[in-house]
């Protein structure tokens, strides 16, 4: 466990799950932001693996060992046993390593890293990497012969694991697949699965605040991909909007959806809105033909380029706008808060309090209680 001031501690648990007072094991070899410890007992030693140096370019893996669980721990003379020392290499920010031994007796280090594109941006956030561990004559583990992370490596001689493809979701089940995430817990009635649709309740708060809820996201896993969703034509009051979002956090995101204009008789517009720190950029929109039952929203991604298109039949797509450099969706995009999760993409609905403040020419009031209905979401790399 990482203590309050970056001090690695181990909590000793009794069988009745009562926690004793913490005991300091080791301050870390680098003495800066030691975290994520893993203990391994091997050949009479307790090996303490740590991530150190923070989540930026100085991220690294170190190891120390002791004959006794509570120390004293001796730092490895080869530390850091994993770090990227070349800023020009594609794989950076290596840390949080865990040693594993295969059934064949081979040792590997599973660790986190970031792959950069463009001018050093890692839009996929922290990814999982694998490199071999070898043990020195004096009993120390070193990773990839201390050469740093490998961009190309021989995979372990193990049975292949076939994972179920959940790239497309027609929302036919009574539950969401594990691909879907919420940045914050939605309202109790915020997400509903009914009649092969996912219904997202319009949030009172917009995406630019941590109070925003009912945002349904999945991780961006590829540098190049296309995402399409089928949205039932919404009935919106002025100021309300719903659709797709390319989302990092409340500071940086893109909205691509149907917006109701702030008019007594609102028009529906298809808009692309960028949020970059304190700046909001609204691009020229397209009038929506709401005589259609559905509208298809499509986002094509090529590294840091995004192209936004729409269709009424899922065949003939019309481009709304292309953005050439969405750097702000990357971990390094802006300096505001902790950023290491990578970009996400998904769906949202925003109600605000526009509906309840709206009155038409006949004195009828609007409502903030609406749901955006999505028939499917498809992700293809």
Task: Show the residue positions of the predicted features.
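Carbohydrate-active catalytic/glycan-binding domains of CAZyme proteins
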Residues: 1-381
């Amino acid at each position: 466990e990482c203590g309050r001031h970056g001090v690695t501690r181990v909590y000793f648990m009794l069988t009745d799950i009562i926690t004793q007072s913490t005991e300091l094991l080791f301050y870390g070899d680098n003495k800066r932001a030691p975290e994520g410890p893993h203990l391994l007992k091997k050949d009479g030693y307790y090996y303490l693996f740590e991530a150190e140096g923070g989540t930026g370019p100085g991220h690294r893996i170190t190891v120390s060992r002791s004959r006794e669980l509570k120390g004293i721990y001796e730092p490895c003379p080869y530390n850091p046993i994993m770090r990227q020392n070349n800023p020009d290499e594609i794989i950076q920010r290596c840390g949080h390593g865990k040693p594993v031994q295969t059934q064949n007796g081979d040792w590997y280090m599973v660790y986190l890293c970031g792959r950069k594109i463009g001018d050093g941006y890692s839009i996929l956030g922290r990814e999982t990497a694998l490199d071999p561990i070898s043990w020195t004559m004096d009993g120390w583990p070193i990773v990839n012969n201390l050469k740093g992370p490998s961009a190309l490596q021989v995979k372990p001689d193990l049975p292949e694991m076939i994972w179920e493809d959940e790239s497309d979701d027609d929302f036919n089940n009574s539950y969401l697949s594990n691909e879907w995430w919420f940045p914050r817990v939605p309202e109790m009635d915020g997400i509903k699965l009914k009649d092969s649709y996912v219904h997202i309740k319009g949030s009172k708060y917009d995406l630019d605040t941590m109070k925003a809820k009912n945002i349904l996201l999945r991780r961006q896993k590829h540098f190049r991909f296309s995402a399409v969703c089928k949205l039932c034509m919404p009935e919106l009051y002025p100021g309300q909007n719903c659709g797709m979002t390319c989302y990092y956090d409340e500071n940086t995101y893109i909205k691509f959806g149907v917006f109701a204009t702030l008019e007594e008789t609102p028009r529906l517009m298809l808009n692309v809105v960028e949020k970059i720190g304190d700046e909001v950029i609204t691009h020229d929109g397209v009038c929506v033909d709401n005589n259609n039952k559905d509208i298809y929203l499509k986002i094509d991604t090529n590294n840091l380029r995004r192209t936004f298109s729409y269709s009424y039949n899922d065949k003939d797509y019309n481009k709304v706008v292309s953005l050439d450099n969405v750097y702000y969706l990357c971990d390094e995009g802006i300096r505001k808060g902790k950023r290491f999760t990578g970009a996400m993409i998904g769906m949202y609905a925003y109600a605000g309090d526009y509906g309840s403040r709206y009155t038409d020419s006949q004195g009828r009031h609007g409502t903030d209680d609406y749901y955006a209905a999505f028939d499917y979401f498809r992700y293809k790399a």
